[in-house]
Amino acid sequence: MEKTKPAAPSSVPRHVAIIMDGNNRWAKKRLLPGVAGHKAGVDAVRAVIEVCAKSGVEVLTLFAFSSENWQRPAEEVGALMELFFSALRREAKRLDENNISLRIIGDRSRFHPELQAAMREAEAVTAGNNRFILQIAANYGGQWDIAQAAQRLAREVQAGHLRPEDITPGLLQTCLATGDLPLPDLCIRTGGEHRISNFLLWQLAYAELYFSDLYWPDFKHEAMRNALADFASRQRRFGKTSEQVEAGARA
Protein backbone atom coordinates (compact mmCIF):
# COMPACT_ATOMS: atom_id res chain seq x y z
CA MET A 1 0.00 0.00 0.00
CA GLU A 2 1.36 3.43 -0.93
CA LYS A 3 2.31 5.96 1.70
CA THR A 4 -0.16 8.76 2.23
CA LYS A 5 -0.17 11.90 4.31
CA PRO A 6 -1.71 11.88 7.81
CA ALA A 7 -5.37 12.85 7.99
CA ALA A 8 -6.27 16.44 8.74
CA PRO A 9 -7.77 16.94 12.24
CA SER A 10 -11.16 17.93 10.79
CA SER A 11 -11.50 14.59 9.02
CA VAL A 12 -10.37 12.27 11.80
CA PRO A 13 -12.95 9.59 12.71
CA ARG A 14 -14.41 9.88 16.20
CA HIS A 15 -14.63 6.10 16.58
CA VAL A 16 -12.34 3.53 14.97
CA ALA A 17 -13.11 -0.21 15.19
CA ILE A 18 -10.51 -2.82 14.31
CA ILE A 19 -10.69 -6.54 13.56
CA MET A 20 -7.19 -7.67 14.53
CA ASP A 21 -6.66 -10.58 12.13
CA GLY A 22 -3.56 -12.46 11.06
CA ASN A 23 -1.76 -13.32 14.31
CA ASN A 24 -1.68 -17.06 13.61
CA ARG A 25 -0.57 -16.62 10.01
CA TRP A 26 2.14 -14.18 11.13
CA ALA A 27 3.46 -16.82 13.52
CA LYS A 28 3.15 -19.69 11.03
CA LYS A 29 5.14 -17.71 8.45
CA ARG A 30 7.97 -17.53 11.02
CA LEU A 31 7.63 -21.19 12.07
CA LEU A 32 6.45 -20.10 15.51
CA PRO A 33 3.51 -21.34 17.62
CA GLY A 34 0.28 -19.41 17.21
CA VAL A 35 0.50 -17.83 20.65
CA ALA A 36 3.70 -16.06 19.54
CA GLY A 37 1.62 -14.16 17.00
CA HIS A 38 -0.88 -13.10 19.64
CA LYS A 39 1.94 -11.91 21.91
CA ALA A 40 3.51 -9.96 19.03
CA GLY A 41 0.12 -8.40 18.37
CA VAL A 42 0.25 -6.60 21.73
CA ASP A 43 2.91 -4.26 20.32
CA ALA A 44 0.59 -3.41 17.43
CA VAL A 45 -2.16 -2.61 19.92
CA ARG A 46 0.13 -0.16 21.69
CA ALA A 47 1.14 1.47 18.40
CA VAL A 48 -2.43 1.88 17.20
CA ILE A 49 -3.56 3.31 20.54
CA GLU A 50 -0.73 5.85 20.37
CA VAL A 51 -1.58 6.99 16.84
CA CYS A 52 -5.32 7.19 17.49
CA ALA A 53 -4.93 9.10 20.76
CA LYS A 54 -2.52 11.60 19.20
CA SER A 55 -4.69 12.02 16.08
CA GLY A 56 -7.82 13.01 17.98
CA VAL A 57 -9.77 9.76 17.71
CA GLU A 58 -12.13 9.56 20.69
CA VAL A 59 -12.91 5.82 20.79
CA LEU A 60 -10.97 2.76 19.63
CA THR A 61 -12.74 -0.61 19.71
CA LEU A 62 -10.61 -3.72 19.25
CA PHE A 63 -12.11 -7.12 18.44
CA ALA A 64 -9.98 -9.27 20.74
CA PHE A 65 -12.00 -12.48 21.07
CA SER A 66 -15.23 -13.37 19.30
CA SER A 67 -17.98 -15.60 20.63
CA GLU A 68 -17.01 -18.02 17.85
CA ASN A 69 -13.35 -18.19 18.91
CA TRP A 70 -14.20 -20.74 21.61
CA GLN A 71 -14.26 -23.27 18.76
CA ARG A 72 -10.50 -22.95 18.32
CA PRO A 73 -8.14 -25.60 19.78
CA ALA A 74 -8.33 -25.66 23.58
CA GLU A 75 -4.58 -25.04 23.87
CA GLU A 76 -4.85 -21.83 21.83
CA VAL A 77 -7.90 -20.62 23.74
CA GLY A 78 -6.13 -21.24 27.04
CA ALA A 79 -3.06 -19.33 25.87
CA LEU A 80 -5.27 -16.44 24.74
CA MET A 81 -6.98 -16.28 28.13
CA GLU A 82 -3.60 -16.22 29.91
CA LEU A 83 -2.37 -13.48 27.57
CA PHE A 84 -5.54 -11.45 28.11
CA PHE A 85 -5.23 -11.81 31.88
CA SER A 86 -1.57 -10.77 31.98
CA ALA A 87 -2.15 -7.90 29.54
CA LEU A 88 -4.97 -6.52 31.67
CA ARG A 89 -2.80 -6.56 34.77
CA ARG A 90 0.19 -5.08 32.96
CA GLU A 91 -1.45 -2.50 30.72
CA ALA A 92 -4.05 -1.03 33.09
CA LYS A 93 -1.41 1.11 34.81
CA ARG A 94 -0.02 2.26 31.46
CA LEU A 95 -3.50 3.24 30.26
CA ASP A 96 -4.20 5.10 33.49
CA GLU A 97 -0.92 7.02 33.22
CA ASN A 98 -1.94 8.13 29.72
CA ASN A 99 -5.44 9.21 30.82
CA ILE A 100 -7.08 6.44 28.77
CA SER A 101 -10.33 4.81 29.89
CA LEU A 102 -10.74 1.07 29.35
CA ARG A 103 -14.08 -0.59 28.66
CA ILE A 104 -14.75 -4.24 27.92
CA ILE A 105 -17.85 -5.34 26.03
CA GLY A 106 -19.19 -8.84 25.47
CA ASP A 107 -20.64 -11.71 27.47
CA ARG A 108 -18.25 -12.16 30.41
CA SER A 109 -20.08 -15.09 31.99
CA ARG A 110 -17.98 -17.70 30.20
CA PHE A 111 -14.66 -16.30 31.40
CA HIS A 112 -12.89 -17.60 34.52
CA PRO A 113 -13.87 -15.65 37.66
CA GLU A 114 -10.27 -14.42 38.08
CA LEU A 115 -10.30 -13.00 34.56
CA GLN A 116 -13.67 -11.36 35.18
CA ALA A 117 -12.24 -9.78 38.33
CA ALA A 118 -9.22 -8.51 36.40
CA MET A 119 -11.57 -6.94 33.85
CA ARG A 120 -13.53 -5.13 36.55
CA GLU A 121 -10.33 -3.97 38.25
CA ALA A 122 -8.81 -2.59 35.03
CA GLU A 123 -12.03 -0.76 34.20
CA ALA A 124 -12.25 0.69 37.70
CA VAL A 125 -8.63 1.89 37.69
CA THR A 126 -9.15 3.80 34.42
CA ALA A 127 -12.78 4.84 34.88
CA GLY A 128 -12.08 8.51 35.55
CA ASN A 129 -9.87 9.07 32.51
CA ASN A 130 -11.15 11.21 29.65
CA ARG A 131 -8.46 11.60 27.00
CA PHE A 132 -9.48 8.55 25.00
CA ILE A 133 -11.64 5.42 25.32
CA LEU A 134 -10.17 2.01 24.55
CA GLN A 135 -12.94 -0.55 24.19
CA ILE A 136 -12.11 -4.26 24.03
CA ALA A 137 -14.65 -6.67 22.56
CA ALA A 138 -14.17 -10.02 24.31
CA ASN A 139 -16.52 -12.98 23.87
CA TYR A 140 -18.45 -10.54 21.73
CA GLY A 141 -20.64 -11.14 18.70
CA GLY A 142 -22.77 -8.66 16.81
CA GLN A 143 -25.74 -11.03 16.77
CA TRP A 144 -25.43 -11.53 20.54
CA ASP A 145 -25.35 -7.76 21.02
CA ILE A 146 -28.54 -7.18 19.04
CA ALA A 147 -30.27 -10.09 20.81
CA GLN A 148 -29.38 -8.82 24.29
CA ALA A 149 -30.61 -5.34 23.35
CA ALA A 150 -33.90 -6.84 22.14
CA GLN A 151 -34.21 -8.79 25.39
CA ARG A 152 -33.73 -5.61 27.43
CA LEU A 153 -36.51 -3.90 25.50
CA ALA A 154 -38.76 -6.96 25.78
CA ARG A 155 -38.40 -6.87 29.56
CA GLU A 156 -39.37 -3.19 29.55
CA VAL A 157 -42.48 -4.01 27.50
CA GLN A 158 -43.32 -6.94 29.75
CA ALA A 159 -43.04 -4.71 32.82
CA GLY A 160 -45.39 -2.17 31.27
CA HIS A 161 -42.73 0.56 31.02
CA LEU A 162 -42.65 0.59 27.22
CA ARG A 163 -45.08 0.07 24.36
CA PRO A 164 -43.95 -2.09 21.41
CA GLU A 165 -44.77 0.73 18.99
CA ASP A 166 -42.35 3.00 20.88
CA ILE A 167 -39.38 0.82 19.99
CA THR A 168 -37.34 2.63 17.35
CA PRO A 169 -33.92 1.96 15.81
CA GLY A 170 -32.57 4.78 17.95
CA LEU A 171 -33.95 3.27 21.15
CA LEU A 172 -32.60 -0.17 20.34
CA GLN A 173 -29.22 1.37 19.59
CA THR A 174 -29.03 2.78 23.12
CA CYS A 175 -29.39 -0.77 24.47
CA LEU A 176 -26.40 -2.12 22.56
CA ALA A 177 -23.11 -2.71 24.36
CA THR A 178 -21.79 0.49 22.77
CA GLY A 179 -25.01 2.44 23.34
CA ASP A 180 -23.49 5.50 25.01
CA LEU A 181 -20.68 5.93 22.46
CA PRO A 182 -20.60 7.39 18.94
CA LEU A 183 -21.05 4.86 16.16
CA PRO A 184 -17.86 3.69 14.44
CA ASP A 185 -16.84 5.89 11.52
CA LEU A 186 -14.06 3.59 10.33
CA CYS A 187 -13.70 -0.18 10.56
CA ILE A 188 -10.30 -1.68 9.79
CA ARG A 189 -9.58 -5.35 9.19
CA THR A 190 -6.03 -6.61 8.89
CA GLY A 191 -4.79 -9.90 7.51
CA GLY A 192 -6.14 -9.62 3.96
CA GLU A 193 -9.65 -10.97 4.60
CA HIS A 194 -12.66 -8.94 3.42
CA ARG A 195 -15.45 -9.62 5.91
CA ILE A 196 -16.63 -8.28 9.27
CA SER A 197 -17.05 -11.64 11.06
CA ASN A 198 -20.04 -10.84 13.28
CA PHE A 199 -18.39 -7.67 14.66
CA LEU A 200 -20.58 -4.67 15.58
CA LEU A 201 -23.19 -5.66 13.00
CA TRP A 202 -25.66 -2.90 13.87
CA GLN A 203 -23.06 -0.25 14.60
CA LEU A 204 -21.15 -0.60 11.32
CA ALA A 205 -24.15 0.24 9.12
CA TYR A 206 -22.55 3.43 7.77
CA ALA A 207 -18.91 2.92 8.73
CA GLU A 208 -16.18 3.20 6.13
CA LEU A 209 -14.44 -0.16 5.66
CA TYR A 210 -10.67 -0.40 5.26
CA PHE A 211 -8.90 -3.68 4.54
CA SER A 212 -5.16 -4.16 4.98
CA ASP A 213 -3.10 -7.10 3.75
CA LEU A 214 -0.75 -6.68 6.72
CA TYR A 215 -1.00 -9.26 9.47
CA TRP A 216 -1.98 -7.66 12.77
CA PRO A 217 1.50 -7.80 14.42
CA ASP A 218 2.83 -5.76 11.46
CA PHE A 219 0.06 -3.13 11.56
CA LYS A 220 1.78 -0.37 13.49
CA HIS A 221 2.25 3.41 13.46
CA GLU A 222 2.63 4.03 9.73
CA ALA A 223 -0.10 1.57 8.79
CA MET A 224 -2.55 3.22 11.19
CA ARG A 225 -1.69 6.68 9.89
CA ASN A 226 -2.26 5.44 6.34
CA ALA A 227 -5.69 4.12 7.32
CA LEU A 228 -6.65 7.48 8.84
CA ALA A 229 -5.40 9.29 5.74
CA ASP A 230 -7.46 7.00 3.51
CA PHE A 231 -10.53 7.74 5.63
CA ALA A 232 -9.90 11.48 5.26
CA SER A 233 -9.92 11.12 1.47
CA ARG A 234 -13.38 9.54 1.33
CA GLN A 235 -16.74 11.22 0.92
CA ARG A 236 -19.31 9.88 3.35
CA ARG A 237 -22.77 10.20 1.81
CA PHE A 238 -25.14 8.41 4.24
CA GLY A 239 -27.62 7.74 1.42
CA LYS A 240 -27.31 11.17 -0.20
CA THR A 241 -25.79 11.99 -3.59
CA SER A 242 -22.32 13.46 -3.95
CA GLU A 243 -23.90 16.73 -5.07
CA GLN A 244 -26.02 16.93 -1.93
CA VAL A 245 -23.04 16.26 0.31
CA GLU A 246 -20.93 18.87 -1.47
CA ALA A 247 -23.73 21.43 -1.30
CA GLY A 248 -24.11 20.79 2.42
CA ALA A 249 -20.38 21.26 2.94
CA ARG A 250 -20.50 24.63 1.17
CA ALA A 251 -23.51 25.85 3.15
From Swiss-Prot:
Its cofactor is Mg(2+). The gene is uppS. The keyword Glycoprotein does not apply. It comes from Pseudomonas putida (strain ATCC 47054 / DSM 6125 / CFBP 8728 / NCIMB 11950 / KT2440). Keywords: Cell shape, Cell wall biogenesis/degradation, Magnesium, Metal-binding, Peptidoglycan synthesis, Transferase. Belongs to the UPP synthase family. CDD domains: Cis_IPPS. One of its GO terms (cellular component) is cytosol. Pfam families: Prenyltransf. This is Ditrans,polycis-undecaprenyl-diphosphate synthase ((2E,6E)-farnesyl-diphosphate specific).
